[in-house]
Amino acid sequence: MSKTVLVFASQSENSAELENKYGKYCVTKSLNLDGVCVEGIYSNRQSLSKVYNTFIKDENSITVFIHDDAYIRDPDWTEKLKTALDKYDVVGLAGGSEAKINAPCLWHIMCPPHTHRGCVSHVNDDRKGTFVTNFGKQGRVLMLDGLFLAFNTKKLFDSGVKFDESCPAGYHFYDIDFSLTCNSKKLKLGTTYIDVVHNSHGLRKFTDEWQSGQAWFMQKVTDGKYNI
């Protein structure tokens, strides 16, 4: 049986600082980590693309890239993931099956609401309890949200797909760029239901770094890099 590798990058110096920052809703508090190889990259100052590429290897395993402020609340998540990977090459929790590429380049805006798939839980503003954001029924998608990305490591390695480290926005656009690159290589992307709580409600403002990442992404679209 192949191992499961759970990878996250955090600007926190260690797990204690991470848990102090996010409380119980963080990746290190996740359920059913027994037998899972947890790879936490602390004090991270590199782009997520650069970190993630080091884990795309020629090995028989399941790799999951997850945000540090995400808590896996589902005790059966590893089994659900294996089942989903029998159907899809890359699995996430939320995404969209069709997209019109335009600004602002956020998957849930570029993808019309009727094409949204999956669901994610979020922490209430008062930090007491959680609520569910239900995007739509589970299914195949064109774009996946980067909160949770899972795949058969060897299969992705053999496809030649990697994250594009040239993106100037270290924590943005890596997911939609990766999704479209996977599609151009004929890999199937889809969502599955795994109960995960995200400690963030998403992007709150368009920073200069985010704007530079958007320009980078739009240029790749213009140059025909994704075959869409």
Regions found by a protein language model. Give the residues of each.
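A short beta-strand-loop structural module common to alpha/beta enzyme folds
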Residues: 33-47
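Short beta-strand-to-loop acidic/aromatic patch adjacent to the donor-nucleotide binding site
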Residues: 61-71
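N-proximal low-complexity "stem/linker" segments adjacent to membrane-targeting elements
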Residues: 1-28, 35
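Acidic donor-binding/catalytic loop of UDP-sugar-dependent glycosyltransferases
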Residues: 70-84
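Glycine-rich, basic loop-to-helix element that forms the pyrophosphate-binding segment
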Residues: 43-59
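Conserved glycosyltransferase catalytic-site signature
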Residues: 48-53, 144-147, 169-180
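C-terminal catalytic/acceptor-binding lobe
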Residues: 165-228
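Conserved catalytic core of nucleotide-sugar-dependent glycosyltransferases
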Residues: 80-162
